[in-house]
Amino acid sequence: MDNTSLLTRGGEIYSRKKGKKQRLEEIVFDKEKRKEYLTGFHKRKVERRKHAQVQLEQQKREERLALRKSLREQRKRELAERLAFSKELNSSLENDEESSQQEDSSSKSDSEEESSMEPKTTEYDEDDKHVTVEIVEDDDDEEIAYPKEGFVTPRISPPPDVPLRPHKPKNAAKKKFRYESKFERTQDRRKEKIRRLKKKIRR
């Protein structure tokens, strides 16, 4: 080996190593995947749209479930309120019935006492006439104890009830039609239900 080859040997090794480092790897494309990517823009767009629709339907379903749950809870609350209200009405009606029974019993005892009282008789003597008057105290028209013998004043029947024609106002101002809000409609419905419940309970 001569001196020049020894001195230039390092340069050759360096150039070989440098060539290995700077050598670029070959890029190889998968033809099928490349073709699918380049021709599948519409397909991917449709898939994205379908995915968005599925998500939207799922969101709507969750909203419907939440709404049903809130409506169920609201109905339960309204039912509890109605039950409490009907219990109060029943208790008040029972109290009214008890008080009316007590009043009836007291009025019956009063009427019995009055009926036990003897009628007052007074006699009037004049020149040619002798008149006997019997006074009976009773509030009930149906239970008046008329004497069997003697004169009885005839009972005058009341005039028949003739329905009068209602007078219509000549210039009745028409009420303006106005749409009610949702809150007003719910309030009106509740009032109507309470009114019906009261009527049912009274029957």
UniProtKB/Swiss-Prot annotation:
Signal peptide: none annotated. Residues 120-132, 178-191 have a biased composition (Basic and acidic residues). It is found in: Nucleus, Nucleolus. GO terms for biological process: rRNA 5'-end processing. GO terms for molecular function: exonuclease activity; rRNA binding. It comes from the Eukaryota. Residues 42-98 form a coiled coil. Keywords: Coiled coil, Nucleus, Ribosome biogenesis, rRNA processing. Residues 87-203 are annotated as: Disordered. Residues 165-177, 192-203 have a biased composition (Basic residues). InterPro entries: Nucleolar_protein_12. The keyword Electron transport does not apply. GO terms for cellular component: cytoplasm; nucleolus; nucleus. Residues 135-144 have a biased composition (Acidic residues). Involved in ribosomal RNA processing. Belongs to the RRP17 family. This is Ribosomal RNA-processing protein 17. It comes from Schizosaccharomyces pombe (strain 972 / ATCC 24843).
